[in-house]
Amino acid sequence: MRRWQLRIYRIAPGAMDAFLDEWRASVRPLRESLGFEVLGPWVGEDDRFVWLIAHDDLEAADASYYASPERAALDPDPARLIEEVQTFLLEQR
């Protein structure tokens, strides 16, 4: 069953443009290369960055992403600009 994860980040004040550039150049293509469906991003009030990812085996694919040498080699790593993370697992019914 395809599962979705909603991710909401609070980005450091003044860093949204840098975060978006780095995320688009590195995180999104890496996720997509590992079979993730990526929707978004959306930017909201209070420096909020919102996106959705989906995969048929979300937990295993997420573990592969974080263990990948490509993820470890991200430079600059956009995660340094994230101040708060909220994640929600979703299933379509």
Feature map (PLM): residue ranges:
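Short, structured motif recognition centered on aromatic/hydrophobic residues
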Residues: 3-8, 19, 30-31, 49-53
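Active-site rim elements
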Residues: 16
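An amphipathic, aromatic/His-enriched active-site/gating alpha helix that lines ligand/cofactor pockets
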Residues: 22-41, 54-90
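Short strand-connecting beta-turns/loops that link adjacent beta-strands
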Residues: 45-47
